[in-house]
């Protein structure tokens, strides 16, 4: 890994992939075709892009039961424990409707309502992610969403990854479709003969999925446009190089565009970590992916002081931040921008990916400066409630009418005055 002495001025805000003109046109064509031809278009795209001809798009209950039965019993118990932790954490995020009554009899409040239906896209490719099923489905269930739909591209044999199906079965999700890519997003947004539309779409995917989510946004809601995974480790001379290297590689192995950065005031630690990364790379199964990520988006930044290192971390605003210093929680108040913060050497990033309970769907590309990770809030909507009393309207009606006329809206003013029997 390259080592660089710095004094601020760094950024994770890489160029956001907007796709080529050809890719954008392809996505628009796919969406239009799915809207026009429904299931027939989905099956054609599945045969073309995934190499499998399907008679039915929907995963059967029997397929889910087989996948669940084939799962190792110990692994199933781990999934159950992780699910319990995730559910316990997210229950604390749930908001209830509330009311307040003022002295004049006015009642004001907020009604919190779960979304009716949500869709979760689970990507295929080089790895299967049952953890993504847990992290997206559980907060939806805690919020009270009644209909949860999963779509995922099928394997060449027409099946979905057993881990994904087993996790969904454990959570009681039964509406799952063998559809991937932009065509899946189109189906979730607009519906087909088999797939009823949803209100909001969640989950990461490739550039075609990202472009499709952008295109359907407004007709339905979306969670975010997820970028490649990121980790920043803030460490001092007390940290262990082998642990830091392992954590950097844990993100680098995700994707060739993943980012892994160490920020430290210790050149000795920087050199040791760089050496340890090379040593650990030798035996990593996904070595080629991790190495490409480190070459393109990996770095070790050396600052003059720990205080400067904290400033650099806040500028980076990473998806994942690990703090491995002599007194990690002493920095809690100064650290402002990160999707998730992991304090201390035993809080390795994969703890949050799989088991601790907080959500692993987090803002990337420096957007942790202004956005948050996935939560129960993403699965509800809030409506203002106003029950104005006659006393209150008589007391404030003239003010409301005056405000309306200030903006040139006479009908607004008259709507108030007719109730005060002052209409002209």
UniProtKB/Swiss-Prot annotation:
EC class of the enzyme, as a word: oxidoreductase
Chain positions recorded as Zn(2+) binding sites: 251, 254, 353, 412
Ligand binding (substrate): 229, 251, 254, 320, 353, 407, 412
Active site: 319-320
EC numbers: 1.1.1.23
Similarity remark: Belongs to the histidinol dehydrogenase family.
Cited function: Catalyzes the sequential NAD-dependent oxidations of L-histidinol to L-histidinaldehyde and then to L-histidine.
Protein name in UniProt: Histidinol dehydrogenase
């Amino acid at each position: 890994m390259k080592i660089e002495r710095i004094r601020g001025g760094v950024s994770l805000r890489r160029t956001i992939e907007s796709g080529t003109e050809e890719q954008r046109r392809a996505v628009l064509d796919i969406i239009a075709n799915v809207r026009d031809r429904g299931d027939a278009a989905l099956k054609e795209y599945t045969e073309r892009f995934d190499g499998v001809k399907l008679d039915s798009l929907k995963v059967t209950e029997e397929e889910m039961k087989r996948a669940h039965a084939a799962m190792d019993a110990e692994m199933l118990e781990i999934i159950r424990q992780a699910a319990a932790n995730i559910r316990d954490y997210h229950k604390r995020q749930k908001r209830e409707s509330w009311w307040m009554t003022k002295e004049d009899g006015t009642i004001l409040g907020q009604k919190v309502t779960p979304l009716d239906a949500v869709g979760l896209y689970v990507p295929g490719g080089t790895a299967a992610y049952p953890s993504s099923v847990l992290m997206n489905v559980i907060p939806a269930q805690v919020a009270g969403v009644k209909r949860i739909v999963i779509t995922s591209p099928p394997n060449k044999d027409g099946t979905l990854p057993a881990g994904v199906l087993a996790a969904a079965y454990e959570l009681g999700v039964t509406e799952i479709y063998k559809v991937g890519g932009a065509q899946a997003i189109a189906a979730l947004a607009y519906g087909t003969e088999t797939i009823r539309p949803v209100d909001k779409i969640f989950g990461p995917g490739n550039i075609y999925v990202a472009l499709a989510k952008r295109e359907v946004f407004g007709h339905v809601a979306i969670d975010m446009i997820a970028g490649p995974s990121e980790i920043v480790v803030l460490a001092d001379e007390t940290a262990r190089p082998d642990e830091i290297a392992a954590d950097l590689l844990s993100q680098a192995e995700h994707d060739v565009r993943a980012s892994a950065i160490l920020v430290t005031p210790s050149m000795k630690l920087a050199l040791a970590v760089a050496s340890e990364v090379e040593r650990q790379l030798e035996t990593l199964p996904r070595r080629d992916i991790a190495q490409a990520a480190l070459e393109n988006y990996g770095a070790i930044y050396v600052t003059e002081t720990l205080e400067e290192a904290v400033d650099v971390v806040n500028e980076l605003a990473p998806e994942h931040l690990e703090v491995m210093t002599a007194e990690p929680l002493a920095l809690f108040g100064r650290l402002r921008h990160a999707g998730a913060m992991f304090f201390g050497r035993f809080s390795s990033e994969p703890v949050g990916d799989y088991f601790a309970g907080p959500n692993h769907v987090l803002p990337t590309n420096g957007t942790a400066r202004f956005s948050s990770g996935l939560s129960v809030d993403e699965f509800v909507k809030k409506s203002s409630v106003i029950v104005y009393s006659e006393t209150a309207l008589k007391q404030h009606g003239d003010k409301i009418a005056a405000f309306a006329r200030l903006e040139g809206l006479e009908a607004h003013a008259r709507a108030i005055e007719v109730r005060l029997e002052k209409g002209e």
